[in-house]
Amino acid sequence: MTDNQEIKPKKLTLGNSKLLLNKSFDSLTGAQSFVNAKSKTLVEVRKSSIGSTTTISLNKERNSLDQSVIDSNKEEFNRRLSILKKAAEQSKLHDPAQISTLSKLASINQSINSKNEQSITDKAVEQKHQNIEDNKVEIAAKIVQDNENISSQIPKKKKETLAKSVLVGMRTRYGIEEEPALEKTVDNKVVVPKIKLEESKKFKKADLFNMLSDDENGSGRTRSLASIKRAREKEKRKLVSQVPEKVYREVTIPEVIGVGDLANAMSERVADVIKELMKLGILANASQTIDADTAELVATNLGHTVTRVQESDVENILINDDKVEDLRTRAPVVTVMGHVDHGKTSLLDALKSTDIAAGELGGITQHIGAYRVTLADSKAITFIDTPGHEAFSEMRSRGAKVTDIVIIVVAADDGIKTQTVEAINHAKAAGVPIIVAINKIDKPDIDIERIKNELYVHEIIGEEAGGDVIFIPISALKKINLDKLEEAILLISEMQDLKASPFGLASGVVIESKIEKGRGTLTTILVQRGTLRNGDIIIAGTSYGKVKKMINDKGREILEATPSVPVEIQGLNEVPFAGDQFNVVQNEKQAKDIAEYRIRLAKEKKISVASRSSLEELLLKASGNSKIKELPLIIKCDVQGSIEAISGSLLKLPSDEIKLRILHSGVGPITESDVSLAHVSSAIVVGFNVRAWANALTAAEKTKVDIRYYSIIYNLIDDVKAIMSGMLEPIVREQYIGSVEIRQIFNITKIGKIAGSYVTKGIIKKGAGVRLLRDNVVIHAGKLKTLKRFKDEVKEVREGYECGIAFENYEDIREGDTVEVFELVQEQRQL
């Protein structure tokens, strides 16, 4: 298109009236469908293709016009725009007369101002025509072609609907206040239907559904919201009525599982699981547990596949393998054993230069302690001190299990004793090297060779005699030969090549545990592998928790502990048992799972033992021997190890007639609840190194509960043994008191036969037991009914005197018979 080419006018339809505007662009350039108003203000008309809206706005051309020209024609433009609005308003009323008048008025106005209008238009075109001429034809052709392609593929109804949406978008975009019905035809490609929107009528959801409707039948009927709602409800009912296909799952079943947990694992209703259990004859609710076999039957009946898992697998995480390259030399762990007062504690005092013996009672170590001694050459030795009384055999056994070397202390002036033999047996069972320290060599009149000979009897043979046991004479008091003892320990440890990995999660053994007011649970542990750090989560037996603080044997707080280092830790939820293995785990959940598993195992074991005891009691009752007495006890101690030792020793007391029952045992002072339990069960409360609280003492006085305090264990055991002995039935024994020879028989009226007798030995008493012998054969055993001296009744007749006797309910007596007289004596039994 050239500059001289004439531009044909374009019709713009307003209602039923047509108003001819000058200077529209050629229809072939549909991309620039716009109308120049009087003052060159551009009125944009959107040229839309169905499904693809293309709008080319020439506002830039408008903005680039001479601002002075626009201002001069502003008033004229407003007048023309007002006429257009009136025309649109009249088109709604469908008044042909008014529409015709407006049309004529517009034509007259057009002719009057044509010259000015033409000059303004020519100037605008002249300024911008050169810039857009090159692209105009190409853009317009492409748009028209796209419109034709898309229009041919879309139904007429849908075209009109989308055209409506386009028109609404135009109004919204350009802020047209009054909405006249417009009809615009561009090359007969797109027809915009007439739309009448009253100002008072609001836009509703139904209008949106109507515009977006895919109805191709051309019905044109608007669907109501109620109809749409009914259709949605129908779809919902259809979905609900469809039964979902059941999903069969693979269920992992542990050794014990709750009914509710099983239902969740299978995604089944709890009621269905309970029904299956009822079919198997089991009545259970959702909170109860069932065994793995029953759970497998239920899951199989419901169509699921089952995978059995051992609950003990939770402890597999505690298994750690050390790499050879990670191993490092560690300090030896030495256990000191021996008899009471043979000098074990004094030896430790001398080795670690501290005095702990002064606090002991009876020369006996009251609980296990662990100490680390650093030698002059920076080498270290860890010592574990076990008590010397046989009551602590179990504690010494645990000490032997964690030790590398055992030192058996023997007093040179006392020799081999019971605890010495016991310590030897523990060391042999542990399979560890033995060093015999012959103590107190500073005393006069000692015989070391005699000690060695006594040890030979127990297969403890020294190196000089071809054995593998080292004998070292020492004096703990005078500190004689202590350096030789240390050298022997280091020599054996080098031969053993003791190594452990300081890397990875720590593990070890519990040496001792207790509860201290203000500090909570205190646990002494020995690290055997890895490195224990503050903040680690550990599991020890059924106890677990986070390590809050670590204190070494010197009383200093430390941040980590390596192998062979004993430390006291805080943070466990309860008191573990001495000898329990401890392990560091990743998180508290793992520790809790392991603890719960171990608690269940302990309960099952306890139930099994209780069932066995009940069966034994039932058998005793069936046999008629139901005279079993019971001694209930409540034991409170300062440390957990003492509880185990006391309980173990008491339960070993032999008695088939007295059953010792420990109702409760714990660490800490005696409380009011302990007294209440003792009152209702008639138990004795025993406190070892602890005392009762004030309210507990008051309650004990009111309820007459027996509370006994002890600080030495063997005194406690002896007292309990005496109490049990007093509960035993006494032994009834015959005690011989004399013999009588029958010399003459007398028949007395109303009395019967009286035997004239002579007391040959001892003394006879009225009411005593008698045995009648004829030719040295016992023919009667009974009771002496009558004893007379001449005509007088007497209580007793001594040797060398004559008397008359008669038996109770027996008269077959003859001259020459011999009578043995005895008394029944009760003797108190001892355990």
Swiss-Prot record:
What range(s) does the tr-type G domain occupy?
329-499
Renumbered to this chain, region (G4) spans: 439-442
G2 as annotated region, ranges? 363-367
Q: Entry's PANTHER family?
A: TR-TYPE G DOMAIN-CONTAINING PROTEIN, TRANSLATION INITIATION FACTOR IF-2-RELATED
Gene symbol?
infB
A single GO molecular-function term is: guanosine tetraphosphate binding
Instruction: From the Swiss-Prot or TrEMBL record, give the protein name.
Output: Translation initiation factor IF-2
What ranges does the record give for the region G1, renumbered to this chain? 338-345
Where located? Answer: Cytoplasm
Q: Which UniProt keyword terms apply here?
A: Cytoplasm, GTP-binding, Initiation factor, Nucleotide-binding, Protein biosynthesis
Q: Report the SUPFAM superfamilies cross-referenced here.
A: Initiation factor IF2/eIF5b, domain 3, P-loop containing nucleoside triphosphate hydrolases, Translation proteins
> What is this protein's function per UniProt?
One of the essential components for the initiation of protein synthesis. Protects formylmethionyl-tRNA from spontaneous hydrolysis and promotes its binding to the 30S ribosomal subunits. Also involved in the hydrolysis of GTP during the formation of the 70S ribosomal complex.
Superkingdom of the source?
Bacteria
* Pfam families (alphabetical): EF-G_D2, GTP_EFTU, GTP_EFTU_D2, IF-2, IF2_N
The record's annotation in CDD domains points to: IF2_eIF5B, IF2_mtIF2_II, mtIF2_IVc
Which parts of the sequence are annotated with region: G5?
475-477
